[in-house]
Design a protein with these regions (language model features):
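Hydrophobic alpha-helical segments
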Residues: 54-182
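Extracytosolic and intramembrane catalytic regions of membrane-associated proteins
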Residues: 238-445
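Solvent-exposed, well-ordered loop and adjacent helix/strand elements within mature globular domains
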Residues: 13-53
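Internal/C-terminal transmembrane anchor helices
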Residues: 165-186, 191-240
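N-terminal signal-anchor transmembrane alpha helix
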Residues: 1-18
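Alpha-helical transmembrane segments and their helix-start/interface "positive-inside/aromatic belt" motifs
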Residues: 1-6, 72-77, 212-218
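Membrane-interface junctions at the ends of membrane-embedded or membrane-associated helices
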Residues: 1, 150-159, 202-208
């Protein structure tokens, strides 16, 4: 039962991350920041690590259920769970007000503020978990891994016989289907798992050498690799972000007040120095307003800073989209004008104008020319300033104007760099990678 549950969850978890390996890469980059784990040397390998973890997690899940390479599978699962449990514990206990010492590029010691990762990315954007929730989840999985280790090293686990395999694989598919349909609103995981199991079982029947289990593993890796290749070169199969097809950007930008909902409550962290001990003390603005006129406070503390971090006191509705801007050359945000345009809008999105320079531009120009002649609005939206946008537009003969937006938000809008977004009345109609830019005729058919 432990093999079935842990293996099935590994398959689902790995597939969700593999579906959006770029998003998982961004999460790894957060962990590598100096204020977090301080591993800047790994940033250039973030995508490779993302793919390795995604495929490795699926492979371990399949191997657990079918009983392949039990000692190796159990050991790697134990190591992985120990690491993930430590990481989520570290994340859950991160103090945003604390500082840490790091050694910078010059070799000097520098004190910087902690950078706390707010979500672990275990299930991508599909199931956002707080660090504490992620830690509890990993703790439970770690406990379930213990019987798997015991069974593997006592010789109780082996490659499934036909009857046992049928029971375990069927049970796993039921668990994956229930998880996918109930929590992910996505039935693809059960299809993917069925294909992976079919490949593994087919190779088990086809080969009888001592390397059979390694050949089965290779087959599953090929299945994972093909899926990963598709999502990296096109777009995620399932999009859980607020810019997904069918989502209204207008509605997702509305505040709690606009929707008649209760918003979260925040306070600002103020810093004061105790005159007697000379130690700094953090006092929240909501508490400060109650004591700032008290004689003991006036006499015992002096102000250091009112510019502290914001602290959430209570949860509430927060806009799904908060930082989407369309800034023109004069520094004006024209986002409302674009979103309220009555008709169709095509947005050429580039999170990194230099890295995506010219990719798909010929197809984009042809599409834009036809679309604009039919009254569509077409714009470019990049991370670059106005002058760089204008240079790009001139160099590649783009017939549409370019605007600027925050790079982090552009990464959320579309994973491909560049990518294309089609909106109508503020609602996302479709998105494409630069490799898949359509012709205008296909849009109006």
């Amino acid at each position: 039962m432990c093999r079935l549950l842990v293996g099935s969850l590994f398959i689902v978890s790995g597939l969700i991350k593999s579906n959006d390996a770029m998003g998982f890469m961004y999460k790894l980059e957060e962990y590598f920041e100096p204020g977090a784990l301080n591993l800047p040397g790994l940033e250039e390998y973030a995508l490779s690590l993302s793919v390795l973890i995604c495929i490795g997690e699926i492979l371990l899940g399949v191997a657990m259920v079918i009983g392949a390479l039990p000692k190796l599978t159990a050991t790697l699962t134990g190591v992985l769970m120990a690491f993930f449990t430590w990481l989520t514990w570290y994340t859950a206990n991160c103090d945003p007000f604390a500082t840490k010492m790091i050694v910078d590029a010059t070799g000097a010691s520098v004190e910087i503020a902690n950078q706390c990762v707010l979500a672990c990315g275990c299930f991508g954007n599909a199931i956002p978990l707080t660090p504490y929730e992620s830690f509890i989840k990993d703790l439970v999985l770690s406990v379930l891994t213990v019987p798997i280790l015991i069974g593997a090293f006592n010789g109780w686990t082996r490659l499934n016989e036909k009857r046992e395999g049928l029971v375990l694989i069927t049970g796993s598919l039921v668990v994956i289907y229930a998880f996918g349909a109930g929590m992910l609103h996505w039935n693809f995981p059960v299809l993917f798992a069925a294909i992976a199991y079919a490949v593994a079982e087919g190779l088990k029947v086809r080969f009888s050498s001592k390397y059979r289990e390694w050949i089965m593993a290779a087959g599953v890796i090929v299945v994972c690799g093909l899926f990963q290749y598709y999502t990296l070169n096109h777009l995620p199969v399932k999009d859980y972000r607020p810019y997904a097809v069918g989502e209204s950007v207008i509605e997702n930008r509305k505040s709690a007040d606009e929707l008649g909902l209760e918003g979260p409550q925040y306070a600002t962290a103020y810093t004061f120095k105790n005159k007697e001990t000379l130690e700094d003390t953090i006092i929240l603005s909501t508490d400060w307003i109650k004591i700032y006129n008290e004689p003991w406070f006036k006499e015992g503390f002096e102000t250091v800073s009112f510019d502290g971090d914001e602290v959430k006191l209570s949860d509430g509705y927060e806009p799904l989209i908060m930082d989407f801007q369309i800034v023109d050359g004069d520094g004006e945000d024209v986002v409302d004008e674009i979103l309220q345009f009555e008709g169709d809008v095509l947005i050429h999105v580039s999170k990194d104008l230099d890295a995506g320079a010219g990719l798909g531009q010929e197809a984009l120009n042809a599409l834009a020319t036809q679309a604009m002649s039919k009254g569509w609005k077409v714009i470019g939206l990049t991370n670059a300033p106005f002058d760089q946008n204008e240079s790009y537009r001139t160099k590649f003969n783009a017939p549409y104007p370019f605007y600027t937006c925050d790079q982090t938000e552009l990464k959320i809008v579309v994973r491909s760099n560049p990518g294309l977004v089609w909106m109508r009345d503020g609602i996302i109609q479709e998105k494409w990678s630069w490799r898949d830019v359509p012709t205008f005729d296909t849009l109006v058919d």
